[in-house]
Amino acid sequence: LWLGPRGGYTAATPRFAKKIEKGGNGYLNSDSMDICVGSEKYLQNLEKFLTDTCTEFDIQYLKLDGFCLKPCTNPKHDHITGGENDMYFVTEMWQRWIDLFTRLRESRAKDNKPLWINMTCYVNPSPWWLQYVNSVWLQNSMDIGFAKNLEQQAQVDAEITYRDSMYYDFMCTRALQFPAKNIYNHEPIYGNTAKVEYTDEEFEKFLFWNACRGQAFNELYLSYNKMNSAKWRILARMLRWQKANHHILKNAMLLGGDPAENNIYAYAAWTKAGEGIIALRNPTDEKTDLTLTLNKLMGCPENLRAVKCYNVYNTTGADSLDLFSYGDKMQITLAPFEMKIFQFGDRDNRCLAPENTNDFTLSFT
């Protein structure tokens, strides 16, 4: 269920908020011209709606999209106001939301049902929230964007660079201590309104790179008319690999420089048992030679001994027959805009063999 607590992001938002108030179900926040998301009666009504709806339709995912744009300062509403930076309102508002989340989870738990809660806009991306929700939006990026670091680059490379530059801002510049697995990043987007066109090869590159960022779930913003048989199979293969290796990918960390400043960078993820995934990318139009050292700077455990290296995505190289241990070095060349994804371990977990699948067509008349 995708629901906007503040009433959406359109010109209709103020009108919707006024209808909520007129119906006695909450209030208009005149400071931001949307629904007052700190109102006690609004949250009571919303909690009942969410609880009943999740139960009736067995909903296991809630995307709560848009919270408090501006604190409400109306003293006639059923919430407190005042304090430095309106913190009286903010504190009470979030406490009410915490109570809502808690009771909602308790309701689902009684039926032995899971519930994934995703908080999007106007939320501080603090790991503190992970006591109550499963994921939080990055907050610092557009739904989709394209980097301007180079004029002559494919659309897919500009999009990848843009999103990773926002990750760099989030993880490195702002140094927000937030686990990658709980980030909501809007990917993958391959829809009509996004105005993107990717070949099958570019689609594969886009999907597998996004998986290496480590997020635990994907919202598939895909327009069916833009998909073909090859793209559906690429998507299925990526999702199988991502799911099978989430125990590794969830530990992803961003290494290197800001890709929007034409820096080579990587995502590296390891387990204590020595399973690892390293994704390297060159966001520039120049060939780059580099030495990859398997040490603690790359997140490698010091007990790494004699593991194999498998190509998850590598269009210019064959699988290596060498065994790698802690401290070993790999000499790598990255062509312009090239990316490589290596998986380390005792066995091949790339999920290359397809599961039992059949081609089929759904027709609607």
Predicted regions and their residues:
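The substrate-binding groove and active-site-proximal loops of carbohydrate-active enzymes
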Residues: L28-E47, T81-R96, A194
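Hydrophobic faces of well-ordered beta-strands that scaffold small-molecule active sites
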Residues: L1-L3, L62-L64, I117-M119, F217-N218
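Short secondary-structure boundary/capping segments
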Residues: F16-K18, H77-T81, Y132-N140
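Active-site groove signature of glycoside hydrolases
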Residues: E47-H79
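Active-site-proximal substrate-binding groove within the catalytic cores of carbohydrate-active enzymes
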Residues: Q95-T316, K329-Q331, P336-F344
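Active-site-adjacent "subsite" loops/lids of carbohydrate-active enzymes
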Residues: L1-F57
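Active-site beta-loop-alpha junctions enriched in small/polar residues
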Residues: W2-G8, F67-L69, T120-N124
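C-terminal beta-strand-rich structural cap/linker in extracellular carbohydrate-active enzymes
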Residues: L321-L362
